Amino acid sequence: MNEPKRFKHESTTLEHLPNELFVDIFGYLNGVDTVYAFSYLNNRFQCLINDYVRDFDFKSVSKAKFHFITQSHQIHQWRSLCLSDGDQTPGQIKSFCQLFPLAQHIHQIRTLAVLDMTPKYAVEFLPQIESFQHLTSLSIGKVCGFNIQSIQLPSLKRLVLTSCKYTSWIMVRDFDVMLIIVNLFLF
């Protein structure tokens, strides 16, 4: 009977490319795809991912991939985050917040997008946004039917709200220079 073949680690041409090239490539990819594709290949890639991948868009990510990324990457270094409770990702926002209470784990976020949030959960989630003192861009998508309370975000420069006509609007205070985009949808 033949012995099972053992795989030897042989260096590939890809592994001889400089780190700077990989950092540039990672910049063109969503952090979710980068971490999912390059994690645990070798120590070099793992270090590059941990040091340079900071932007994560979970808008259309499966639950399995979502859990893999959140368990295998250091979220306290994230710079940008997009969460969605859309048709493909129901309950994602609540699941993320249960795993990682916002004020404790991702207070360093600079760009935050929360999309398709249910009104019931928005009442719990939105007051926590004030803990993001470094937030420069905030997008809140498709919230409808409730009062959005006043929040203070001193670093905020860009605010995008997508809502319906049944939402009482947020009170915006203390903004020097800010781009505000408001989208209304009717249903």
Task: For every predicted segment, state its role.
Residues 1-187:
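The conserved beta-strand core of Leucine-Rich Repeat
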